[in-house]
């Protein structure tokens, strides 16, 4: 491991001195590192590589991170599902809007479909104007263009775009004349009673991959020839010179811009280059029109199509004006969608880790009580719920003793006479995902016991034998000055409430909901 380039290894030091724990941003400049930086020593322990540097700094790297392959930014063909229409014979990626809003797992599945397959359809979005903006805002931000924050796709008397007519539209990407191009497009169907007007999608990455396989020279021409995409009307003049197929430095397909209507005059010093471009352009266009690549479906009122505008080409069949066809659309960007998806996955992983504690260590003895640790915390949460407590206090009651599993000392150490300060270690661990409205009652719930024993006559007599013992280890009842100071703390009242539920939650065999009952509540509180 120590054969790794030293400046690369040190530049990626994850310690709090080198990176802000809240956001991972570096706290030093690369030229702050000394000349001749070298590894002075290293050891492997507990799944980590520990490095002592020649300047005295110490770093600790997870071995799993050192072995991890380059993930990229998720924008290239790597890891994507390149598809033909037959791949969706069982059905296209879709979900109910109400389920998407209510269930983080359902939202993650929809966003992952857009990332991996390039699109998804939400069903049951209210068929009223401007709802498409709400869909975009559910995962990101609306991209405003010269068409406004949203646009209507219907027949216009004086259209400035073929989209606003009833004619058929061949597969294309939108706004190729804009740099950066809007990377996501949303189309929400309000009405579709006309004959025709079916929607179509083509996987541009798949078409480009076919071209690369069948005619690699043509593929290479389209990756290196700048194409002027232009748009103008009375108020707008836009141009972007980009290749039809854009690849990353490793040669992986990253973006397709394809819109015959918007291509301006391609120029080259050598006419042979123009011949090569047009031969490649025509071949690529023919591939996009192959029947096996054409996925056709009909949007009904309430359907909202979300798709990757840097990958998928969308199309429309002609329609008759014997009925009405009205869609509203808007643009958004993949960075927000990918960010939201990553956060959803991060939260799900955190909830899985907490659930594993309840099912694993939580199934063990709870400090000499007649219930397990998990039963105790679930009973506390159930008591909070029964009392009509706000969600953040139900969460605090559920998680108040999570610190017994973290920190230098375990819960068993507390019973052996060492204060494991589980309220602090638990709050610190939970602070990675929850705000102070959850973590501070957790942090203060031990102090709340000491406070109540000092100020509330008869409270101490209610303590169980184990709780009485831990009280002595944790400092005993507060004195008058300590109690007054505690009462002034911002989270004191909530901590006292959690403490009362804590003391109630020691009944052997009491029925309670399981951890999964509280997962949606916790997910809604995570940040």
Language model feature labels by segment:
Residues 2-103, 112:
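Motif-centric detector for short Cys/His coordination patterns
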Residues 22-30, 118, 172, 309, ...:
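Residue-level detector of functionally special positions within alpha-helical transmembrane segments
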Residues 27, 31-38, 155-160, 165, ...:
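Aromatic/His-enriched, Gly/Pro-containing loop or helix-boundary segments
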Residues 45-47, 57, 115-116, 385-391:
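Short, solvent-exposed loop/edge-beta patches enriched in aromatic
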Residues 58-60, 119-123, 144-148, 435-443, ...:
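Short secondary-structure capping/junction motifs at helix and strand boundaries
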Residues 71, 76-119, 124-306, 310-346:
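Active-site environment of non-heme Fe oxygenases that use a 2-His-1-carboxylate facial triad
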Residues 347-527:
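Metal-dependent phosphohydrolase cores
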């Amino acid at each position: 491991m120590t054969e790794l380039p030293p400046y690369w290894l040190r530049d990626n030091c994850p310690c709090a001195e080198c990176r802000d724990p809240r956001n991972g941003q570096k706290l030093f400049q690369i030229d702050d590192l000394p000349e001749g930086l070298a590894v002075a020593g290293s050891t492997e322990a507990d799944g980590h590589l520990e490095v002592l540097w020649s300047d005295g700094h110490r770093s600790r790297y997870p071995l799993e991170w050192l072995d991890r392959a380059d993930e990229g930014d998720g924008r290239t063909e790597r890891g994507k599902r390149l598809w033909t229409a037959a791949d969706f014979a069982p059905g296209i990626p879709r979900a109910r809007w109400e389920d998407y809003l209510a269930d983080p797992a359902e939202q993650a599945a929809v966003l992952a479909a857009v990332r991996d397959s390039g699109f998804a359809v939400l069903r049951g979005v209210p068929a009223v104007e401007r709802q498409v903006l709400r869909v975009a805002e559910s995962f990101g931000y609306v991209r405003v263009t010269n068409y406004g924050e949203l646009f209507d796709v219907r027949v216009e008397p004086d259209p400035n775009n073929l989209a606003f007519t009833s004619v058929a539209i061949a597969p294309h990407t939108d706004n190729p004349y804009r740099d950066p191009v809007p990377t996501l497009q949303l189309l929400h169907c309000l009405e579709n009673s006309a004959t025709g007007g079916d929607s179509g999608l083509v996987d541009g990455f798949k078409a480009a991959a076919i071209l690369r396989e069948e005619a690699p020279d043509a593929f290479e021409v389209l990756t290196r020839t700048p194409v002027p995409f232009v748009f103008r009307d009375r108020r707008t003049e836009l141009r972007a010179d980009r290749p039809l197929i854009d690849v990353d430095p490793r040669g992986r397909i990253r973006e397709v811009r394809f819109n015959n209507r918007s291509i301006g005059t391609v120029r080259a010093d050598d006419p042979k280059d123009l011949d090569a471009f047009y031969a490649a352009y025509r071949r690529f266009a023919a591939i996009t029109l192959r029947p096996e690549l054409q996925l056709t479906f009909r949007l009904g009122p309430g359907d909202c199509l979300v798709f990757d505008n840097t990958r998928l080409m969308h199309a429309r069949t002609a329609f008759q004006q014997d009925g009405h066809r009205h869609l509203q659309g808007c643009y958004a960007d993949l960075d927000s969608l990918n960010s939201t998806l990553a956060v959803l996955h991060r939260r799900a992983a955190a909830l899985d880790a907490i659930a594993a504690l309840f099912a694993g260590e939580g199934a063990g003895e709870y400090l000499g009580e007649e219930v397990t640790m998990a039963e105790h915390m679930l009973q506390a949460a159930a008591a909070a719920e029964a009392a009509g407590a706000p969600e953040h206090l139900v969460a605090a009651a559920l998680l108040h003793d999570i610190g017994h599993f973290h920190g230098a000392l375990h819960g068993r150490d507390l019973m052996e006479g060492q204060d494991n300060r589980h309220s602090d270690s638990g709050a610190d661990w939970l602070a990675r995902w929850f705000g102070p409205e959850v973590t501070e009652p957790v942090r203060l719930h031990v102090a709340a016991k000491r406070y109540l024993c000092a100020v509330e006559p008869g409270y101490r007599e209610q303590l169980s034998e184990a709780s009485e013992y831990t009280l002595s280890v944790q400092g005993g009842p507060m004195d008058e000055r300590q109690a007054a100071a505690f009462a002034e703390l911002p989270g004191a009242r909530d901590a006292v409430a959690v403490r009362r539920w804590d003391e109630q939650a020691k009944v052997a065999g009491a029925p309670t909901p399981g951890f999964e009952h509280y997962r949606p509540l916790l997910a809604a509180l995570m940040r």
